[in-house]
Amino acid sequence: MAELYYDNQADLNRLKHKPIAIIGFGSQGHAHARNLADSGLDVRVGLYPGSKSWAKVEEAGLKVMTVAEAAREAQIVMILTPDIGQAELYREHIAPAMEPGKTLMFAHGFNIRFGQIVPPAGIDVSMVAPKAPGHRVREVFVQGGGVPALIAVEQDATGGAFEDALAYAKGLGCTRAGVLRTTFAEETETDLFGEQVVLCGGVSALVKAAFETLVEAGYQPEVAYFECMHELKLIVDLFYQGGLNYMRYSVSDTAEWGDYTAGPKIITEQTRAAMRQILADIQSGAFAEDWIEENHNGRPRFNAYRQADINHPIEQIGRELRRMMPFVNPREVKPGEGGA
């Protein structure tokens, strides 16, 4: 059974006299820094000199300094920059300040799980991973609630690593909802698997393949877009609110019957075998090795994949149709922009 922890099991006073450095001020960094500060903790934000976020931190009324300065001042250092780049950042700016008794924290276990960051033996290494994007972590906290989080300890040099991580989660507001104990390996492997098989890779490939099937059969691309892309949100929202059962309660009996009869034809034993292989590649480190090498080589395949999908007909049609629907709050990525 999962171990769950709540507000009454976390002691925020453990961190009252432990300066905290938040490294990065993106989606999660912004939320962590502001929530912890509002919880009465001593927070500073570490950024590269000249970072575009420097002024934003100052506008938020928080202390801002270089990464190295923040790491030196802090007892707890939370790294909230993109996975690729963390190892170099750690080696050059954080590692020199990690004296025995300090804590190194993460919100995702990639660099610890795959050996890109190897902390010294004398420090605590833990993780607090809110299960929501940063803006939602902040929004729910301000409303008096919290989002669930995962918590893990990789290295407990002081004997209090878990209790400190739990207190940190309380500072974010996460123990108001509930915090689930896990391990760095479990969080990392399941997170990558979910992204690849369902949330990003699986859904994207399914949507494109279904769209292409309809268009090749002679149906209008606009109609195919509505059926295969646009309406997906309606179903996902039902999943989000009440799971598979609530979705099936909410759709027509015809749709539910098609769910039962057609779904297994899409997710076949061959599909499941591919899922198992993807998981094996994650567990063995093959995926991480490939991704790290891709970045070292300047991302040629990554950029080619991205450009190919930008030019896919479903994206061309989608841009036009979303202009008809201002109520969906359309967004467009400008050339050269990309995710973290």
UniProtKB/Swiss-Prot annotation:
Binds 2 magnesium ions per subunit. The active site is at H108. Residues 183-328 form the KARI C-terminal knotted domain. InterPro entries: 6-PGluconate_DH-like_C_sf, KARI, KARI_C, KARI_N, KARI_prok, NAD(P)-bd_dom_sf. NADP(+) binds at F25, G26, S27, Q28, S51, S53, D83, I84, G85, Q86, G134. Keywords: Amino-acid biosynthesis, Branched-chain amino acid biosynthesis, Magnesium, Metal-binding, NADP, Oxidoreductase. Residues 2-182 form the KARI N-terminal Rossmann domain. Substrate binds at S252. One of its GO terms (molecular function) is magnesium ion binding. One of its GO terms (biological process) is isoleucine biosynthetic process. GO terms for cellular component: cytosol. Its cofactor is Mg(2+). Its EC number is 1.1.1.86. It comes from the Bacteria. It holds the Pfam family KARI_C. It catalyses: (2R)-2,3-dihydroxy-3-methylbutanoate + NADP(+) = (2S)-2-acetolactate + NADPH + H(+); (2R,3R)-2,3-dihydroxy-3-methylpentanoate + NADP(+) = (S)-2-ethyl-2-hydroxy-3-oxobutanoate + NADPH + H(+). Pathway: Amino-acid biosynthesis; L-isoleucine biosynthesis; L-isoleucine from 2-oxobutanoate: step 2/4; Amino-acid biosynthesis; L-valine biosynthesis; L-valine from pyruvate: step 2/4. Mg(2+) 1 binds at D191, E195. Mg(2+) 2 binds at D191, E227, E231. Involved in the biosynthesis of branched-chain amino acids (BCAA). Catalyzes an alkyl-migration followed by a ketol-acid reduction of (S)-2-acetolactate (S2AL) to yield (R)-2,3-dihydroxy-isovalerate. In the isomerase reaction, S2AL is rearranged via a Mg-dependent methyl migration to produce 3-hydroxy-3-methyl-2-ketobutyrate (HMKB). In the reductase reaction, this 2-ketoacid undergoes a metal-dependent reduction by NADPH to yield (R)-2,3-dihydroxy-isovalerate. HAMAP family: IlvC. Belongs to the ketol-acid reductoisomerase family. This is Ketol-acid reductoisomerase (NADP(+)). It comes from Chloroflexus aggregans (strain MD-66 / DSM 9485). The lineage of its organism: Bacteria, Bacillati, Chloroflexota, Chloroflexia, Chloroflexales. The gene is ilvC.
